[in-house]
Each structure stands twice: as structure tokens, then as C-alpha cells.
């Protein structure tokens, strides 16, 4: 899982380290995400969860947050039952992500992916509520933010916005 604005970073790291194309899902407000909405973009909740087909093949039940280890949060949850290759891969994923978040010219956050998600959600809500409620003002606000972000990105690409100014704007968002 990851927030929309982190998809480019997550995609590049997962492809480089794991050789896989990530499947994106917006994080649930659960577990380590209980404190979502404090201004931190998040990613990698359930990153090594066993795929449903493999879990079914093994006869395991669904558990979240542990990669599919059915001993999770029991007295049997000890290091020797962990899949060391998965642990090493996860460590590499986390370290490369941290490196890219801390050693950058431009902060690797794409806020326009978030505005696209907001716009899509507003369209779905408008379709669901029909004429009972008008979400046009909210949609206009998202559109205005997206246009401002497009100008910022164009300024970055064209060199008229410095890395310092771009990163300050991205952090402030």
C-alpha cells in the first residue's frame, strides 16, 4: 500500500530491488496507519504480504501485517520461522527508499497523483449522490490545486524553480 503521491518512488524501488511491478492500494486506517492524517506520506503497509493464491494453496488464513506468517502475534512467532530472503529483500527496499528520500535533489513526491485520486473520488461521490449534493466547488478546488502543481512541475523541469524552493513547496504540501 502507499499514498498516491509516493507511487513513483515505491514503483522504482520495488522494481529495482524485487524485480516486480507493485500493486497499489490506498492504505487502510489500521495498524501502523492509525495515525494517518498527521501530514506524513506513507507507504509499504503489508508490503510482503503473501498473495491470496499462495496463501490459499498453503491452507493459511488471512493475517495482515506479517507477510502471511500464521504464527504472527503468537508465542510461536520466533525469528527462525521467518523467511530470511523476504526479510533481506524488505530491508533492501526500506533502505533504498530511505536513501532516495534523504539524498535527493528534488523530493520524490508527486502531488499530482494525489490530486488525480481526489478528482476521481469526487467524481464517484458526485455520481453516488446525484443531485442531492453539489461537489462542484470541491472539484474546482482540486482542479485549481492540480493546475498550480502543474505550473510548479513545469518550473522545475524548465529550471525556473530552484531545488530549494521546489522541495520547500513539496514539504509544505
What is each model feature region?
Residues 1-71, 83, 129-172:
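Metal-dependent peptidase/peptidase-like ectodomains
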Residues 16, 100-104, 124:
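A structural signal for alpha-helix termini and helix-coil/disorder junctions
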Amino acid at each position: 500500500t502507499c499514498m498516491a503521491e509516493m507511487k513513483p518512488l515505491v514503483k522504482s524501488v520495488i522494481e529495482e530491488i524485487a524485480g516486480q511491478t507493485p500493486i497499489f492500494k490506498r492504505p487502510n486506517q489500521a495498524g501502523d496507519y492509525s495515525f494517518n492524517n498527521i501530514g506524513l506520506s506513507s507507504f509499504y503497509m503489508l508490503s510482503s504480504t503473501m498473495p491470496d493464491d499462495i496463501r490459499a494453496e498453503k491452507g493459511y488464513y488471512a493475517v495482515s501485517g506479517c507477510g502471511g506468517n500464521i504464527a504472527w502475534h503468537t508465542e510461536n512467532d520466533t525469528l527462525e520461522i521467518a523467511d530470511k530472503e523476504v526479510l533481506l529483500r524488505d530491508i533492501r527496499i526500506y533502505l533504498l527508499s530511505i536513501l532516495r528520500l534523504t539524498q535527493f535533489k528534488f523530493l520524490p513526491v508527486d502531488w499530482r497523483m494525489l490530486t488525480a485520486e481526489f478528482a476521481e473520488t469526487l467524481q464517484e461521490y458526485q455520481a453516488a449522490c446525484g443531485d442531492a449534493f453539489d461537489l462542484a466547488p470541491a472539484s474546482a478546488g482540486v482542479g485549481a490545486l492540480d493546475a498550480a502543481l502543474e505550473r510548479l512541475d513545469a518550473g522545475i523541469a524548465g529550471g525556473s524553480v530552484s531545488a530549494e524552493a521546489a522541495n520547500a513547496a513539496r514539504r509544505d504540501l
